[in-house]
């Protein structure tokens, strides 16, 4: 079954963390496997910043998903055993209500009139969807990068129906370097003349492509770039090369930027990167205790030692904090020349798959 959509918050509006409301909210999602009679065999999979709900193929000729190697009969997320749900995040642009959606009050796209939102708001929408789908318990919430932030929020806000968390390459709070990169990317978009205060007709392609290029430099490593590109040049030149020498790394980054603008919305990029910046579960909650101290369910944290976006020292610090507060946390580190995006790379599956499979297989037995 491919992308489905469900309209939520029709009678009672979605109340966001900042006090604003929104109604209705359309959610795009895909499911794999079958919900059990006891409705407690669900795994919720969270995508990263620019991901979609299409996590895996549904049939042989289907478009590849972003986690095909982990999903299917007999695989890590065994669809003969689990009912997997993957949503497009609230505020995104691939099936779920976001800045490019039509504002029912005006008949025009929300654009920058869309309300600000947090990671907590994203999972609130997911919780409503799962309730509508009849899910009563979640075996595990799994996510990498921004998806790991969502998974962590689930452990805090909805531990009553969640049995475990798997967080890959995501800290307990966005660090200053990640926030800085996000600022640079947003400024590239905001300073594009075609952005027009968010009221663009076509994409502000130059700014959005530049933002993507900056992002790609943080998702990979200098080791990988050196091995793949060295100082090699390509035959064709480009105005951006500013000379007849056009380096392969330049061509690669331009390709990444050019293809990205065809599938992603600039306003969504602004909102989602800001939601990442604001994520901080180390901050005191209403009871003056750090929000993460409420986590009482098994929590797998996987850090990537070569990560250029969410640095390994932040993951290690997160692990120490979780231990200090008696969170039942398991921590592993993976080394990879692919850096932050290693968990999305087919070649690196043998490094991650055993950790995830072992964690899931050692959870307390439930009626699944």
UniProtKB/Swiss-Prot annotation:
EC numbers, comma separated:
2.3.1.31
Q: What Gene3D superfamilies does this protein's entry cite? A: 1.10.1740.110, alpha/beta hydrolase (3.40.50.1820)
- Catalytic residues in the record: 145, 307, 340
What GO cellular-component annotations does this UniProt entry give? cytoplasm
Residues forming the AB hydrolase-1 domain are 43-346
Q: Which residues form the signal peptide?
A: none
Which reactions does this protein catalyse?
L-homoserine + acetyl-CoA = O-acetyl-L-homoserine + CoA
From the UniProt record, give the pathway where this protein acts. Answer: Amino-acid biosynthesis; L-methionine biosynthesis via de novo pathway; O-acetyl-L-homoserine from L-homoserine: step 1/1
Entry's Gene Ontology BP terms: methionine biosynthetic process
In which residues is substrate bound? 212, 341
Q: InterPro entries, alphabetically? A: AB_hydrolase_1 (IPR000073), AB_hydrolase_fold (IPR029058), HAT_MetX-like (IPR008220)
- Cellular location of this protein? Cytoplasm
Q: Which UniProt keywords apply?
A: Acyltransferase, Amino-acid biosynthesis, Cytoplasm, Methionine biosynthesis, Transferase
Q: One GO molecular function term?
A: homoserine O-acetyltransferase activity
Name the domain of life this protein comes from.
Answer: Bacteria
Q: Which PANTHER family match?
A: HOMOSERINE O-ACETYLTRANSFERASE
Name the job this protein performs: Transfers an acetyl group from acetyl-CoA to L-homoserine, forming acetyl-L-homoserine.
UniProt lists the family membership as follows: Belongs to the AB hydrolase superfamily. MetX family.
How is the quaternary structure described? Homodimer.
Protein name, as recorded: Homoserine O-acetyltransferase
Tell me the organism's taxonomic lineage. Answer: Bacteria, Bacillati, Bacillota, Bacilli, Bacillales
- Give the gene that encodes this protein: metXA
């Amino acid at each position: 079954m491919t992308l489905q959509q469900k309209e939520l918050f029709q009678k009672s509006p979605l109340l966001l963390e900042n006090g604003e409301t929104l109604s209705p909210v359309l959610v795009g999602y895909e499911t794999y496997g079958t919900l059990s009679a006891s409705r407690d065999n669900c795994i919720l999979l969270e995508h990263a910043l620019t991901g979609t709900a299409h996590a895996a193929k549904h049939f042989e000729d289907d478009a590849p998903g972003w986690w095909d190697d982990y999903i299917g009969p007999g695989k890590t997320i065994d669809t003969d055993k689990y009912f997997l749900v993957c949503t497009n995040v609230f505020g995104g642009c691939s099936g779920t209500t976001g800045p490019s959606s039509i504002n029912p009050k005006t008949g025009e796209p929300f654009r920058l009139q869309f309300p600000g939102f947090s990671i907590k708001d994203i999972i609130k929408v997911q919780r409503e969807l799962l309730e509508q789908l009849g899910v009563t318990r979640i075996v595990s919430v799994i996510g990498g990068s921004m998806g790991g932030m969502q998974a962590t929020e689930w452990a805090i806000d909805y531990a009553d129906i969640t049995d475990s968390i798997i967080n890959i390459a995501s800290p307990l709070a966005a660090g200053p370097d990640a926030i800085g990169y996000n600022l640079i990317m947003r400024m590239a978009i905001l300073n594009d003349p075609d952005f027009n205060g968010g009221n663009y007709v076509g994409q502000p392609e130059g700014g959005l492509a530049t933002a993507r290029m900056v992002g790609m430099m943080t998702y990979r490593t200098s080791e990988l770039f050196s091995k793949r590109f060295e100082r090699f040049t390509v035959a064709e030149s480009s105005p951006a090369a500013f000379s007849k020498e056009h380096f392969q790394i330049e061509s690669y980054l331009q390709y990444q930027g050019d293809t990205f603008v065809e599938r992603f919305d600039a306003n969504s990029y602004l909102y989602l990167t800001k939601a990442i910046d604001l994520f901080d579960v180390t901050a005191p909650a209403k009871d003056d205790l750090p929000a993460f101290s409420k986590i009482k369910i098994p929590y797998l944290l996987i850090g990537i030692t070569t990560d250029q976006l969410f640095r390994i020292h932040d993951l290690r610090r997160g692990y120490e904090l979780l231990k200090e507060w008696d969170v039942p946390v398991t921590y592993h580190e993976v080394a990879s020349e692919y850096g932050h995006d290693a968990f999305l790379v087919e070649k690196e599956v043998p490094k991650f798959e055993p950790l995830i499979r072992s964690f899931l297989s050692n959870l307390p037995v439930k009626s699944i």
